[in-house]
Each structure stands twice: as structure tokens, then as C-alpha cells.
């Protein structure tokens, strides 16, 4: 095939949503010449659904992206209207930060970053085809018949792939927020031999702020204590003048309106055929599935400081517009609310993720990567996490460097990608803390400790950032050593002070670290006995120290499990293995192995339907093959 390339790039990224911007920024910062192509520049890093970043598990992903050298955390720290730490009354493993975003400002701020990034070209164009030669991605062709060469292509098209919006009996071709759908590229991905699925998501109506009666709703303010997503943000820049959200509920009348109109609901008439998200169902789905519930929470979330639009969180729907209006007016506080936008469902094509490697490169086509909702996930944060990994690995591949694979013990990003490529997904995938078996070591407070060194090694963490990280790490290490070296003895004077503070007296000598391990004792209590650290420690380091010490036993057990799994991950499976050549493994295991083609024993062990006996047989088979190869090599010598 002869192509007429008018421009040449190292990497072309298709789609400028949250996955696309992270992929393109990472690759360009690693020295690659990158083209970021988008159908509509005005929608760069746009939030077509909820105007927020973070939340349970998701907030930790944002910090992981930041630790690796990504941009989402920095951008939301510049553009939030409210910041809140969730689950503060629970254990450290499930705490996470959530921000209400000024969605227009967020998009503009990210666009400014992209436009000012060296090596990165932003262009509004529609990509119709990925050009492939000898099993390798070599470029793209646009709708205007321009051909651009590339050594790698990353598809981050979100819900635009053959997107269709559904409102009642109305169904039309569209991407998110009534943008153009990408039809030809969807066809092209099928023609390239990729297996394609069909998913669905939705969004609620938006109402006018000045038409809401806030007096009958419950105010939900942000936090006064400074918190940030990015480890580079400063407490003195924390926004105190925050915009509150408001809580209201559906009621019996709301439910009756929905029940009376189920015959007009696309979810139940067969119009919607795509699989929807389990953890973010439409309101009509909730009313049917949870018929015993008298009410459902709804959060009224402002979409920015300079807009009247308010997002009705929890009211996602594709009901006809007239039904949506009646439904909105049945809700306390929204009796006279003006609906500014109608809720809708959107169906879209996605690439079944079992076809991907852990680098997010497709197994079928070398140099073709996919990330974000294209891979079947939901959420801006999940998209950003995949985007930065795809961008990093595309850059490493064309630079001839070792790939970056995040393990399940490295971060929630690693958990997500492993789930996708090992188990696949039959519905839009959402990250949850319950998906992570090592969640006590994958906390919001230690993402930088886990991943900054990786970001530095690949070139995404600059000298200034690295110097700040080293200072923090040294302060943490030094204080942990100090606490372990100082002894508190059960002498009269010490115990008098211990009892005065309301604690049980000491019966044996203990280190300051052991004393801090007591649930009721805080770091400041310990300092009252041993004095402050040589260098003043900020609250974030103190939080990290307390968590590491108080949960040391559990963390140690988790690390033992990590070491065991690491040994299994180090046992590679040859890419050309003949699964039919292995005797005695169960039929289901053989079928799953053929479908997923696991790269390591560890990955093989996590495939659903594969039992320990199958893994044992596989390991015996591989050991036999290795012995056979060794004997052959010895004979040839």
C-alpha cells in the first residue's frame, strides 16, 4: 500500500478527552512528536456528565496520575469550586478526595496546558481510519483525506464511536453533549479485526440555579481544612470561598411518575440495547430494581461559578422530555425548576479489553493503543489513568525502552488495567476500593511514595518536583527511624503524664513507635514525650507516619502477599504457546487462556474460571518446556 503522508509524527492520539490529553501530554513530555486530534477543540477535557473529579477510589487514581507526572490533579486544583475529603470516619484505605469542578474553566485550563506543550500539536479534525501495514499501525487518514504518518496510534474516542443519543422515542447519531459521532472509525476498528462491544451510559437533566428553592434542601459544604489532589499544590492557595452543593430526594410522587411511564422508557421498551453501568444506574432502573426504597438521594451540583446550570446527580434518565419535566417538578426544592438541558442516554462502541496487553497496546496490531471509555471503563479518572499509561508505553515502545506495567500492588491504575485485560468487562467498568486486594497500601496519602520514582525514571517528573519529593521522603524516613529509636520507660514521671492524658500506664519499656501504635494515641501525643522532629513536619507527612505505624501489622501482611504474587508475575508465559498442547487442564481454562493469552503465571491465576489445579498443570508444562529447550541448547554446543 502506498500512502501519501503530508505530515509525520511519532505518536497520534485520536480524541482529546481525559484519556487523550494525558496520553498526549505524557508522550510529548517524553520527547515524542505528538498530534492530538479531536472532532471539536472546544470539548477538550470536557465534562459531558458530572462536574466533579475524584471520589472513592477515583480520587486515589487522580493522585496516582499526578505522582507519575500527569496533569489532571494540577488542573482540578486550579479550577475547583468545592473540595471535600470523603470517608473521614472510616479507615485510611477508603478515604479519598472529591472536588466539584468549574467544568468550563477546567476545560480551558487544560486546553491552555496542551496548547503550550512543546512537541504537541493540537488539531480539530475527524480521523476516519487507522492505517496498518504488516500488522503495524503506521498512521491515520482523516475525513478530508489527509494522511499522517505515525509510529504509534492511541485511540481515546470516549463515547463518540458510533454514538447514539436516546431521549424517549428519539434516537439520533451523536457523540457526547450532542457533538459529532465517529462512524467511519468505528467501522475501521471492526475491519482491523478487533472485537467490538456496545455499552450505554447516561446523564441527568440540568436545572437553572435561580429557579431552585434551596430552603427546603440540605446544604453540603466543602472542607475548611486544605486538601489538594496534586502533591505540588500549596495550602496557601486553598480556596476558602467554596460553592456548596445541596441534597434533596425523590419521593412517592416521583416514583409514581416513573412507574406510570415505563412503557415510554427506552430502557424498558427495547430501544436501549447497550449495557449500562451497574454502579450508576438510571433513575428509572433504580425505581424498578429497588422498588422497596421510599426515596433516593439527589445532589444538586453547580457546574461552575459563572453559570446557572445545576447538575442533578442521581437523576440520570432517558425518559421523554415531558416526563423528565414532571419528574423534576415532583422533587422537593425543584417544584418550579427550569430545565436547561434534558437528560439522555448514549450508546457507543467500545473495544473489548481482553484484546489488550497490560501496556494498553492491542495484541493484534503492533503500535495501536486504546485508553479510556474506548476500553469499556466509565469515569474521567479511570480514563486519565489509562491515558497516561498508554501515552507512556507508546513513547517507550518507539524509543526502544522497557515498557511500564503497573502491578496491582503499585496502584489503582494497575488494578484497573489488570481487571480489564485479564477479566474483561461486560458493563462499563468503574473503580471501587473493593476491587483492590492491597487497598491498605494503595492509599490516597501515599500515592507519591508509590509512584514518583517511576515517573522520574521515565522522564515525567522534573528536577524541582523530584527535589521536593526527596525532602519529603527523607523527612518521613528520618522520623520513622527516630520514633523507633527512642524508648519510653514505665517510670513514675512518665506514667503520671500518660495517665494525665487519659491513657493506660506503661507496664514495660516501649519505643515511641510502639506507643503511637495504640489506637487512642496521636503523633502529637508522642511528641509531648519525645519532643518534635529536627525538621518541622507538615500535616500530610504526620498523617502518613500515623497510618504506616498504626496499621503496620496489616500492611506487613499485605506486603507478604505482594511478594508472593511478584514471584508469580516474574514467571513469563511464551507469546507463542500452544494451549492445545497442554494435557489435563480444564476445558474452561483452556478456552479462557486462548481468549486472553495471559503473559505471566500471575495473570493466568487471576482469570475467572481458572482454578489452582489448572495453574499447577500450566507451571509443570512450562518447566518441562524450559528443560527441553535447555537440553537442546546444550546438545547444540
Swiss-Prot record:
Biological role: NAD-binding protein involved in the addition of a carboxymethylaminomethyl (cmnm) group at the wobble position (U34) of certain tRNAs, forming tRNA-cmnm(5)s(2)U34.
Binding site for NAD(+): 276-290
Disulfide bridge map: none
Protein family membership: Belongs to the MnmG family.
Compartment annotation: Cytoplasm
Keyword Flavoprotein (UniProt): yes
Subunit (UniProt): Homodimer. Heterotetramer of two MnmE and two MnmG subunits.
SMART domains per record: GIDA_assoc_3
PROSITE patterns attached to this UniProt entry: GIDA_1, GIDA_2
GO BP: tRNA methylation; tRNA wobble uridine modification
Keyword line: Cytoplasm, FAD, Flavoprotein, NAD, tRNA processing
Protein name stated in the entry: tRNA uridine 5-carboxymethylaminomethyl modification enzyme MnmG
Cofactor: FAD
One MF annotation (Gene Ontology) recorded for this entry: flavin adenine dinucleotide binding
Entry GO terms, CC: cytosol
Pfam family, one: SAM_GIDA_C
Ligand binding (FAD): 15-20, 127, 182, 373
Amino acid at each position: 500500500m502506498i500512502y501519501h503522508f503530508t505530515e509525520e509524527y511519532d505518536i497520534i492520539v485520536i480524541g482529546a478527552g481525559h484519556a487523550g490529553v494525558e496520553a498526549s501530554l505524557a508522550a510529548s513530555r517524553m520527547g515524542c512528536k505528538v498530534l492530538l486530534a479531536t472532532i471539536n477543540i472546544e470539548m477538550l477535557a470536557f465534562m459531558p456528565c458530572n462536574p466533579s473529579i475524584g471520589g472513592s477510589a477515583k480520587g486515589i487514581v487522580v493522585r496516582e496520575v499526578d505522582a507519575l507526572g500527569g496533569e489532571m490533579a494540577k488542573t482540578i486544583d486550579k479550577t475547583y469550586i468545592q473540595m471535600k475529603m470523603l470517608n473521614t470516619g472510616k479507615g485510611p484505605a477508603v478515604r479519598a478526595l472529591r472536588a466539584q469542578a468549574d467544568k468550563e474553566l477546567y476545560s480551558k485550563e487544560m486546553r491552555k496546558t496542551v496548547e503550550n506543550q512543546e512537541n504537541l500539536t493540537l488539531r480539530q479534525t475527524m480521523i476516519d481510519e487507522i492505517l496498518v501495514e504488516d500488522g503495524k499501525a503506521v498512521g491515520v487518514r482523516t475525513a478530508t483525506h489527509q494522511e499522517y504518518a505515525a509510529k504509534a496510534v492511541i485511540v481515546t474516542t470516549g463515547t463518540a464511536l458510533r454514538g447514539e443519543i436516546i431521549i424517549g422515542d428519539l434516537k439520533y447519531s451523536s457523540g457526547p453533549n450532542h457533538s459529532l459521532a465517529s462512524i467511519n472509525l468505528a467501522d475501521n476498528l471492526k475491519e482491523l479485526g478487533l472485537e467490538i462491544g456496545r455499552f450505554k451510559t447516561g446523564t441527568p437533566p440540568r436545572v437553572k440555579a435561580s429557579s431552585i428553592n434551596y430552603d427546603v434542601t440540605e446544604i453540603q459544604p466543602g472542607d475548611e481544612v486544605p486538601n489538594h489532589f496534586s502533591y505540588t499544590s500549596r495550602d496557601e492557595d486553598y480556596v476558602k470561598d467554596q460553592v456548596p452543593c445541596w441534597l434533596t430526594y425523590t419521593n412517592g410522587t416521583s416514583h409514581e411518575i416513573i412507574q406510570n411511564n415505563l412503557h415510554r422508557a427506552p430502557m424498558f421498551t427495547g430501544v436501549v440495547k447497550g449495557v449500562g453501568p451497574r454502579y450508576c444506574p438510571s433513575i428509572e432502573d433504580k425505581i424498578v430494581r429497588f422498588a422497596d426504597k421510599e426515596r433516593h438521594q439527589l445532589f444538586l451540583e453547580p457546574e461552575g461559578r459563572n453559570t446557572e446550570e445545576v447538575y442533578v446527580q442521581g437523576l440520570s434518565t432517558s425518559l421523554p422530555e415531558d416526563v423528565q419535566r414532571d419528574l423534576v417538578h415532583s422533587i422537593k426544592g425543584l417544584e418550579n425548576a427550569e430545565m436547561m438541558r434534558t437528560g439522555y442516554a448514549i450508546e457507543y462502541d467500545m473495544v473489548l479489553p481482553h484484546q489488550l496487553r497490560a501496556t494498553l497496546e492491542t495484541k493484534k496490531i503492533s503500535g495501536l493503543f486504546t485508553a479510556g471509555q474506548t476500553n469499556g471503563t466509565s469515569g474521567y479518572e479511570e480514563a486519565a489513568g489509562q491515558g497516561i499509561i498508554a501515552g507512556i508505553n507508546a513513547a517507550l515502545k518507539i524509543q526502544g525502552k522497557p515498557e511500564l506495567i503497573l502491578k496491582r500492588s503499585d496502584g489503582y491504575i494497575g488494578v484497573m488495567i489488570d481487571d480489564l485485560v485479564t477479566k474483561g468487562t461486560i458493563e462499563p467498568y468503574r473503580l471501587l476500593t473493593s476491587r483492590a486486594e492491597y487497598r491498605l497500601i494503595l492509599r490516597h496519602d501515599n500515592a507519591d511514595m508509590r509512584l514518583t520514582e517511576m515517573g522520574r525514571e521515565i522522564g515525567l517528573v522534573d528536577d524541582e518536583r523530584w527535589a521536593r519529593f526527596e525532602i519529603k521522603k527523607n523527612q518521613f524516613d528520618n522520623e520513622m527511624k527516630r520514633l523507633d529509636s527512642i524508648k519510653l520507660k514505665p517510670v513514675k514521671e512518665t506514667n503520671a503524664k500518660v495517665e494525665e492524658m487519659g491513657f493506660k500506664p506503661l507496664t514495660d519499656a516501649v519505643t515511641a513507635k510502639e506507643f503511637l501504635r495504640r489506637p487512642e494515641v496521636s503523633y502529637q501525643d508522642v511528641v509531648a514525650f519525645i519532643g518534635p522532629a529536627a525538621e518541622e513536619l507538615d500535616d500530610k507527612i504526620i498523617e502518613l507516619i500515623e497510618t504506616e505505624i498504626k496499621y503496620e501489622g496489616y500492611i506487613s501482611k499485605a506486603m507478604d502477599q505482594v511478594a508472593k504474587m511478584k514471584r508469580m508475575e516474574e514467571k513469563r508465559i511464551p507469546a507463542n504457546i500452544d494451549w492445545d498442547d497442554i494435557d489435563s487442564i480444564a476445558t474452561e481454562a483452556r478456552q479462557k487462556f486462548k481468549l486472553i493469552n495471559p503473559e505471566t503465571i500471575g495473570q493466568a491465576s487471576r482469570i475467572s474460571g481458572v482454578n489452582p489445579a489448572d495453574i499447577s498443570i500450566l507451571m509443570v508444562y512450562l518447566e518441562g518446556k524450559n528443560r527441553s529447550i535447555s537440553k537442546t541448547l546444550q546438545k547444540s554446543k
